[in-house]
Amino acid sequence: DWSSDVCSSDLELLTWWMTEENFHQVIDHFLVMRICLEPQACLLAATVGTAEQKAHLNTLMAEMAALKENFRRERWIEVDMAWHEHIYEMSANPFLTSFASLFHSVYHTYFTSITSDTVIKLDLHQAIVDAIIQSDGDAAFKACQALLRSPDK
């Protein structure tokens, strides 16, 4: 079992441990953790996020939408990661923010693996932004669950 070999003090090592053989297992574990934490981060972003933070989230979402018309794969991955990390920052919870930082490279590996030649789940990302901007924590929580539970491709 690869998980017993991972040093808990340096979770960034996960990307080093990730091999072609265990990639899907690592990602499955990562997605379980995301489904536990990310909807709560969205709820908090909606309820405690500042107007300035919400405006920045809207700017990131606008860039994601623009990439639908003029897709650039590397830029999509950067903006999608920034979008998710910004929501964690908006939660104002240092543990949630630390999660996003700790797993930055795992997020990058995951987003790189699922991104091909088009934007991904734009409408589901927009539903989260709409709920956060409207300060509707419950809707943000549910919209995030919908995003994380829908198929990647």
Which residue ranges define each predicted feature?
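Short, small-residue-biased leader/transition segments that mark boundaries at the very start
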Residues: 1-8
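Hydrophobic, amphipathic alpha-helical faces that serve as interaction scaffolds
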Residues: 9-13, 18-23, 33-49, 62-65, ...
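A short, structured loop/turn motif at beta-sheet edges
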Residues: 50-57, 90, 133-136
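C-terminal all-alpha effector/ligand-binding and dimerization domain
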Residues: 58-61, 65, 70, 78-79, ...
